[in-house]
A protein has these predicted regions:
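N-terminal helix-turn-helix DNA-binding core of bacterial DNA-binding proteins
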Residues: 3-4, 8-36
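Basic amphipathic alpha-helical segments that dock to polyanions
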Residues: 30, 41-51
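Short, surface-exposed, charge-dense and proline/glycine-enriched linear segments
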Residues: 47-48, 59-66, 85-96
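Amphipathic alpha-helical dimerization/coiled-coil segments
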Residues: 76-109
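Short, charged/polar surface micro-motifs in flexible loops or helix N-caps
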Residues: 23, 47-51, 76-78, 96
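Short, cationic-aromatic polyanion-contact patches
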Residues: 3-11, 26, 57-82
Length: 109
C-alpha cells in the first residue's frame, strides 16, 4: 500500500505507470513519450520494479545483438479513499501482467 501511495505522489512515476499500463514498452520509449531524463527514468523504473508495481514483460534482442527490456505496469486502476483513521487502497490488476508474474513465480519452483 505504501509503495502505491508513494508512486501516486510522484509525477514521473505516474507517467511511467500510465505509459506502461496497456502495453509492454521499451524503457527508451518511456523516456521519449514521458519526457523524463534518462537517468531519472532508469532510477524510477528500477524503483517500480523493486516494489512490484512494474514488471519486465519480455526481453528482446536486436539484429546487432543488443538486449533491451519491455516493461509493463502491474496495475490497471486504483481507488484510494480515507475513512475514519483508515486509508483504503483498492487496486485492479492488469491481468496480462499478473499472469506473467504468476508464471515466473511458478517456474522458479
Amino acid at each position: 500500500k505504501q509503495a502505491i501511495l508513494s508512486a501516486l505522489a510522484d509525477e514521473e512515476l505516474v507517467k511511467i505507470l500510465n505509459c506502461s499500463m496497456y502495453r509492454a514498452i521499451p524503457v527508451n520509449n518511456i523516456i521519449k513519450e514521458c519526457n523524463i531524463p534518462h537517468t531519472t527514468a532508469y532510477r524510477k523504473i528500477n524503483w517500480l520494479l523493486d516494489k512490484g508495481l512494474l514488471l519486465i514483460d519480455k526481453i528482446e534482442i536486436t539484429s546487432d545483438g543488443k538486449k533491451y527490456s519491455l516493461v509493463r505496469s502491474v496495475l490497471k486502476s486504483l481507488h484510494v479513499r480515507y475513512e475514519y483513521n483508515s486509508l483504503i487502497v483498492e487496486a485492479e490488476y492488469n491481468l496480462d501482467a499478473a499472469e506473467k508474474l504468476t508464471e515466473r513465480f511458478l517456474s522458479l519452483k
